[in-house]
Amino acid sequence: MELGTKFPLSKSCKDESRKRKRGITIDCDSQILVGDEQSNSTKTKPYDEICENIVPNYTFGNYILQKIDPNDCRHSLHPLYHRLFYIADVIKQGISEGSLLENKYSYILETEHILLDESRINNLSPSIHASRWCKMVESLTRLQANSELWHIFRQCLLTASSVKWSPNGTINTAGLITNDLPSRGQTESILFGTRNESLAKSLIAALCVSQSSVRTIDNSDKKNEFDNTTTGILDIEKYSCGLMIDIRTGMLGASLDMVMCNRNRHGILAPCLTDNNIETYEIKCRFKYAFCPEMRSELSQCYERLMATKTVQWFRRFLYTIDCPCVDYFRPDNYPRAKEALITSDDDWKVGHSAYHAAQSRIKCNEFEMHHLTLNKNMSSRVWLFGEPDLQTNSIYPLLWNTGERVLSIPIFANPRHQNFKQIFLQSYVASGYFGNRKIVPFLATFIGRHRRQTELGRCFSLFVDDTEASEVVYEITPEQAIPVILIITPVIIDNTFYVGIEESGYRAFGELVDHLWAKQCRI
């Protein structure tokens, strides 16, 4: 694919660009880091404080205007190389300013000359070395929102969490230049998710992840430092994932919540030779169910009945107690609304507001949504229920359902019309470039927790996977975290034949970005 066709510029703009090629300054949205993003202080740094440390300086927009000649776009580098060279510039600038420690980033800069040599002879598709760079960038940004580099590298990217989808099922690439920094302050729902994501991760790691899925590197005798076969409290950070930049186009990005994959001694993703599948998890902590059990409400009463009976009937009643439940019912002869991430057409779930809306509406779906609805409609979700804290031992255990089973299977599946599904789809597309022929197996995790009683405030609780004497603590629930109530794990089936459209959107976005920047520069 030649890039020259993607940068149509007017003659006046081209002429003006020659005059302005040197000494360019623009007011494009920008971020640059101050402070060592790998330091221990960064890990505990407040979210808003990250924003204070990022100041305007050198952006991807600056890079494009300085390095891409609009008159010679046909011979321009592949967009991914431009993205990686910009990242190298940021790291070098951070080192020169003293905001980054050179010894922590030397291993990536030492191979920049190889990347440059390969880019000169390969403008159609990225090289294996470029792929390695992307993996190194991912390893540098695993702190995500607590990483300055993560904020910087996300700029001018179509990210899985923020991309807009057109009604026809394609990505809307308009308005790519936006300020990706988080807004000052956070809503209560965002804070709830931020505080409890690590708790949800520990539940997933303890209850869903097979111990056999994490082995030593290439089955060698040398133990992987990210191995999960040790006992005791789980190290959930080994499943964390940094910014994955689309290896195909360099214009899309995704930061997954959990990736079940080994890493080498440098922290680079390194799946075992026998790993055919790579599991990923997108976690949603549903604040709308965060009730206070000491305040009498319909939700708290349903919770009490659920704790007493442990039946699917009262689980369903609990979910449907609120006005906008997290599971939406639709008629089998119709399509679901885009309102909720989880849906069902099972008649047992035809209750409450969902049943009313299902009877009132006729829904239109695009090809992407209809196809993935067919793929997912026969899938089931797994549900775990957690008991009340034991205040004498400060312990919490999963409960057995009335069937005697620890896991309940319910006819609930992922909604292809919802933004969460499309976010996971784009994540899977980006992640697929990092694991060769291995299949990406995504899941949507729904965590429901409640507020604490007065007697539970200020306490740390030990989380166990069961109530047997042999059970070990897998996580320490901190005083600011919620009391876990329910964990729902929903498989998401993806058809990768739709990846072609995503790739085309990435290339189109790069062309539109260059056009926009140079057109804006011509008007200055």
Curated annotation (Swiss-Prot):
The keyword Thylakoid belongs to this UniProt entry's keyword annotation: no
Superkingdom as given in the UniProt entry: Viruses
GO CC annotation terms, alphabetical: host cell cytoplasm; host cell nucleus
This enzyme's EC code(s): 3.1.-.-
Molecular function via GO: DNA binding; endonuclease activity; exonuclease activity
Predominant place of localization: host cell
Site feature (Required for function) residues: E197, D257, E282, K284
Localisation: Host nucleus; Host cytoplasm
This protein's UniProt keywords: Endonuclease, Exonuclease, Host cytoplasm, Host nucleus, Host-virus interaction, Hydrolase, Nuclease
Family to which the UniProt record says this protein belongs: Belongs to the herpesviridae alkaline nuclease family.
Protein role: Plays a role in processing non linear or branched viral DNA intermediates in order to promote the production of mature packaged unit-length linear progeny viral DNA molecules. Exhibits endonuclease and exonuclease activities and accepts both double-stranded and single-stranded DNA as substrate. Exonuclease digestion of DNA is in the 5'-> 3' direction and the products are 5'-monophosphate nucleosides. Additionally, forms a recombinase with the major DNA-binding protein, which displays strand exchange activity.
Name of the protein described by the UniProt record: Alkaline nuclease
